[in-house]
């Protein structure tokens, strides 16, 4: 059922809008206590991340779909982004640390591609892999001298793809689902590339 729903992926828009509503309220709530105190702020986001992750790991065992789609069980990933920002602002890495973090991030991304597939219970502990990878790469990129391992990620073409990535994400799924009704896509590399190319053009146009 989900594989034939052309608008399934728009759940992320709902989570995003909830994030825009809830996150500012959290910041206002803790501002008097944490203003000018990055360590306190870090502890707060770590607490949010821990509670949300525990809820996610508990719920995914019995209601994997709810754990996947609900904002409270994905809030730990938003909190991880907040922690990455705090690290980049207040604990910038040395070049040696940035090199280590960049290779760690890339390694975790590769491991994610290998370990996570359609049969993987998700989001579970496996969701830590791409999340920690993103944190490591963001922290590594906050140094003045970029490590060689992540310089390609900061190139103009990659930045252009980054700017288009969310629009591309919004277009790719309906084109794949609708395209499957016209041409066989699953298991056909050429048609898959064609569908992804069309979704990229749609992202550029919009």
Where are the predicted features?
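Membrane-interface helix/loop caps of multi-pass membrane proteins
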Residues: 1-206
């Amino acid at each position: 059922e989900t594989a034939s729903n052309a608008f399934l992926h728009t759940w992320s828009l709902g989570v995003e809008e909830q994030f825009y509503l809830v996150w500012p309220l959290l910041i206002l709530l803790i501002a008097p206590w944490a203003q000018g105190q990055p360590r306190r702020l870090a502890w707060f986001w770590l607490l949010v991340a821990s509670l949300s992750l525990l809820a996610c790991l508990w719920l995914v065992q019995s209601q994997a779909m709810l754990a996947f789609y609900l904002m409270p069980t994905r809030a730990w990933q938003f909190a991880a982004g907040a922690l990455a920002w705090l690290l980049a602002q207040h604990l910038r890495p040395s070049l040696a640390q940035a090199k280590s973090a960049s290779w760690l991030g890339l390694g975790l991304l590769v491991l994610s591609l290998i370990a996570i597939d359609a049969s993987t219970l998700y989001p579970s502990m496996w969701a830590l892999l791409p999340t920690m990878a993103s944190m490591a790469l963001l922290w590594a990129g906050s140094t003045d001298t970029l490590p060689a391992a992540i310089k390609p990620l900061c190139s103009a073409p990659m930045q252009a793809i980054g700017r288009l990535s969310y629009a591309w994400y919004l277009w790719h799924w309906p084109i794949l689902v609708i395209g499957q009704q016209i041409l066989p896509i699953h298991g056909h590399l050429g048609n898959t590339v064609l569908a992804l190319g069309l979704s990229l053009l749609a992202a550029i146009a919009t």
